[in-house]
């Protein structure tokens, strides 16, 4: 039995890294929509590769046509937004390849999209990737795990109601 289940009577829910790289505090994101937690609490990852995978089991709620972002609803209820880069909607899908579509049931680790980090950077965009829990206010415990290098599937957020 883990510490969360001892304290709160049930196991905590976890969100894993959807992309490999350096996990950092959300406040390091220069876009205030993310950095000031307007959309919800979260973390950001400075990607070291161009693959985005499902951070938990759930359903694809919205795969943006431009491929720069995806929102999922976790089986445990968290509403998760993964936004690859800042202002990358302006690329209109260039340098992104989408594998998942709206309504798809996904398992942790399933490939959602790929992107070309070098090409996006070369066009002048920051590829920092916010991972936001849009309904973070529904949780009494929100524990980010940042300040480390992560690979896809590593735990980056712990939640408990």
Show the residue positions of the predicted features.
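Contiguous, well-folded functional domains in the mature portion of proteins
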Residues: 2-161
């Amino acid at each position: 039995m883990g510490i969360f289940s001892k304290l709160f009577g049930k196991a905590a829910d976890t969100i894993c890294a959807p992309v490999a790289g350096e996990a950092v505090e959300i406040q390091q994101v220069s876009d205030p929509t993310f950095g000031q937690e307007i959309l919800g609490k979260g973390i950001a990852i400075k990607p070291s590769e161009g693959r985005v995978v499902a951070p938990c089991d759930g359903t694809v709620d919205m795969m943006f046509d431009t491929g720069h972002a995806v929102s999922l609803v976790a089986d445990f209820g968290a509403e998760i937004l993964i936004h690859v880069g800042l202002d990358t909607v302006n690329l209109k899908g260039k340098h992104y390849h989408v594998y998942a579509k709206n309504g798809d049931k996904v398992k942790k680790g399933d490939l959602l999209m790929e992107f070309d980090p070098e090409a996006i950077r070369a066009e002048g965009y920051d590829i920092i990737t916010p991972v936001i829990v849009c309904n973070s206010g529904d949780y009494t415990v929100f524990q980010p795990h940042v300040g480390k290098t992560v690979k896809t599937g590593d735990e980056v957020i712990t939640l408990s109601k």
